[in-house]
From Swiss-Prot:
It comes from Rattus norvegicus (Rat). InterPro entries: DES1/DES2, FA_desaturase_dom, Sphingolipid_d4-desaturase_N. GO terms for cellular component: endoplasmic reticulum membrane; mitochondrial membrane. The keyword Ligase does not apply. This is Sphingolipid delta(4)-desaturase DES1. A motif (Histidine box-3) lies at residues 259-263.
Amino acid sequence: MGNRVSREEFEWVYTDQPHAARRQEILAKYPEIKSLMKPDPNLIWIVTSMLLVQLASFYLVKDLDWKWLMFWSYAFGSCLNHSMTLAIHEISHNFPFGHHKAMWNRWFGMFANLSLGVPYSISFKRYHMDHHRYLGADGIDVDIPTDFEGWFFCTTLRKLVWVILQPLFYAFRPLFINPKPITHLEVINTVIQVTFDVLVYYVFGVKSLVYMLAASLLGLGLHPISGHFIAEHYMFLKGHETYSYYGPLNLLTFNVGYHNEHHDFPNVPGKNLPLVRKIASEYYDNLPHYNSWIRVLYDFVMDDTISPYSRMKRPPKGNEIQE
């Protein structure tokens, strides 16, 4: 149902991603930005507090009627769990403990992962590094939808369904685009997570377990914060590959909206990205950006020129080394 989109293919490009060149140019002009490339130990206490709040919510919802449980799962738990996935994004860049304590960050990522209900942090780290190094590379960057997604989700209604099911596509897309051997850390992540889920079930009951899982599924689907999935790299304007968002939801998402700044300087923690924009304002103020993720979701669904195919894609160069 709804109009069919006009785009029937990805936007193939044969140039390098813009972020490395812009990073070099900005650092040559503003070397003080290097001082922003440092750990953010505040993440340790923020993440711990978020997990404790979610544990408290497990107790508060355990005896609710199902309708109210689902209401609070969407209205509250989803915000907390989506925010936690973006905390895990910060952790994947080694910001809590720094690069010299990489394994501390991996263990902390598994700790942050607990409230999500499904193992996520270790696999995300492996694929997210590819996303930065090989942005848009065919068969490597699993942030790019599959051809099936672009072909099938091609009407207004189907695009809405695609948005609702986004967490499932992000979970299973790597298996089709860029499958990797399972590592021992992924096994450990899974064992820890399943053990925690079983404990939630035995301590709080099935309703708390459903609340936790539904919060992740709903929070990563049709949800205001989920606008960042589409806002970051979907090509609403031809020739522009990455877009920043400067609205209030950055307060809940560790400034993930500062996405041009993040790709230009992936070693700068989220709390310092507004300073990058302030220092090098002439490089960012004139780039296309958003102020509403809700509007991004609406435009994606309703605009007949936008679809899962609206991504810039590059052929792999043949020398990519993946972990």
